[in-house]
């Protein structure tokens, strides 16, 4: 099955309505029964942004790459039920064996940021950038991207990046070529490049809709070309949010994810990956005060886990990631019962040609220290 077939089948095999009528107790009992029956043959990774009702059944929690790597090391599992979004399940499929079956409980669980860069747009951008800059551009893609985009990057000598290793990967990329095309999240690219000492005046933005480069200046000065994409959740944190919490309590620590805008990151006390945010709160002194700028399910979980600290969301009106939230207890149960019947649905299988090139991008990242 090609990756395009997988994407087009997102609405196939919809969960029967009867699952929504079950009580949480009924669903939990049936989920645990299947987990016990399958034992090590079943592995459920759960992303940090998942609801508590799902995370309680996860065999491992982490960010997208951590979970894919954990799945890769798990040679016993016949079925990997990935509680995350589509691109995460794709990465897990590419890093696991052909015999292992990766399942996404709800095929509608996509990622708006990953969908902001498709192959038609990327090929068009590459064509124009090559005309402008010749062979001086290397592509990097955030792991929050489709398998096809990772494959494009791999074919063209680039690598994938995470929010944890973005600085290291940009440094490596600039040792390879004069310029970087950073996909699909402009904010992570901009914040990371700025931290490395690259001024905003040397960063341009590629608009895939208008198919043009946004830059006021001499083209030869451009070092970073940022794809005009963003995370719909993290872009909602604002400078006004920071000013509001600081005016209310000057002692509060503001920590945000680098997918937030540059203005928000610049005004925050700390910024970093999901892991850095979690570690920072874990290591903070009792009684310390924190306003966190990241996904609401994770913030709520951190608040519950640290009653000795004063923690709140930087934006009190923030909603959880809507696509991540498509994975819920009814969909998890349905997915597991389909596996139990021998009729798994929501199977993610990346075309081998795409996987081969995408793995190049992933492996380059994993080997660069």
Swiss-Prot record:
<comment type="pathway">
    <text>Cofactor biosynthesis; NAD(+) biosynthesis; quinolinate from iminoaspartate: step 1/1.</text>
</comment>
<feature type="binding site">
    <location>
        <position position="231"/>
    </location>
    <ligand>
        <name>[4Fe-4S] cluster</name>
    </ligand>
</feature>
<dbReference type="InterPro" id="IPR036094">
    <property type="entry name" value="NadA_sf"/>
</dbReference>
<feature type="binding site">
    <location>
        <begin position="142"/>
        <end position="144"/>
    </location>
    <ligand>
        <name>iminosuccinate</name>
    </ligand>
</feature>
<keyword id="KW-0662">Pyridine nucleotide biosynthesis</keyword>
<dbReference type="InterPro" id="IPR023515">
    <property type="entry name" value="Quinolinate_synth_A_type3"/>
</dbReference>
<feature type="binding site">
    <location>
        <position position="274"/>
    </location>
    <ligand>
        <name>iminosuccinate</name>
    </ligand>
</feature>
<dbReference type="Pfam" id="PF02445">
    <property type="entry name" value="NadA"/>
</dbReference>
<dbReference type="GO" id="GO:0034628">
    <property type="term" value="P:'de novo' NAD biosynthetic process from L-aspartate"/>
</dbReference>
<feature type="binding site">
    <location>
        <position position="47"/>
    </location>
    <ligand>
        <name>iminosuccinate</name>
    </ligand>
</feature>
<dbReference type="GO" id="GO:0008987">
    <property type="term" value="F:quinolinate synthetase A activity"/>
</dbReference>
<dbReference type="GO" id="GO:0046872">
    <property type="term" value="F:metal ion binding"/>
</dbReference>
<dbReference type="GO" id="GO:0051539">
    <property type="term" value="F:4 iron, 4 sulfur cluster binding"/>
</dbReference>
<keyword id="KW-0411">Iron-sulfur</keyword>
<keyword id="KW-0408">Iron</keyword>
<protein>
    <recommendedName>
        <fullName>Quinolinate synthase</fullName>
        <ecNumber>2.5.1.72</ecNumber>
    </recommendedName>
</protein>
<feature type="binding site">
    <location>
        <position position="64"/>
    </location>
    <ligand>
        <name>iminosuccinate</name>
    </ligand>
</feature>
<keyword id="KW-0808">Transferase</keyword>
<feature type="binding site">
    <location>
        <position position="111"/>
    </location>
    <ligand>
        <name>[4Fe-4S] cluster</name>
    </ligand>
</feature>
<dbReference type="GO" id="GO:0005829">
    <property type="term" value="C:cytosol"/>
</dbReference>
<keyword id="KW-0479">Metal-binding</keyword>
<keyword id="KW-0963">Cytoplasm</keyword>
<feature type="binding site">
    <location>
        <position position="163"/>
    </location>
    <ligand>
        <name>iminosuccinate</name>
    </ligand>
</feature>
<dbReference type="InterPro" id="IPR003473">
    <property type="entry name" value="NadA"/>
</dbReference>
<feature type="binding site">
    <location>
        <position position="321"/>
    </location>
    <ligand>
        <name>[4Fe-4S] cluster</name>
    </ligand>
</feature>
<comment type="similarity">
    <text>Belongs to the quinolinate synthase family. Type 3 subfamily.</text>
</comment>
<feature type="binding site">
    <location>
        <begin position="257"/>
        <end position="259"/>
    </location>
    <ligand>
        <name>iminosuccinate</name>
    </ligand>
</feature>
<comment type="function">
    <text>Catalyzes the condensation of iminoaspartate with dihydroxyacetone phosphate to form quinolinate.</text>
</comment>
<keyword id="KW-0004">4Fe-4S</keyword>
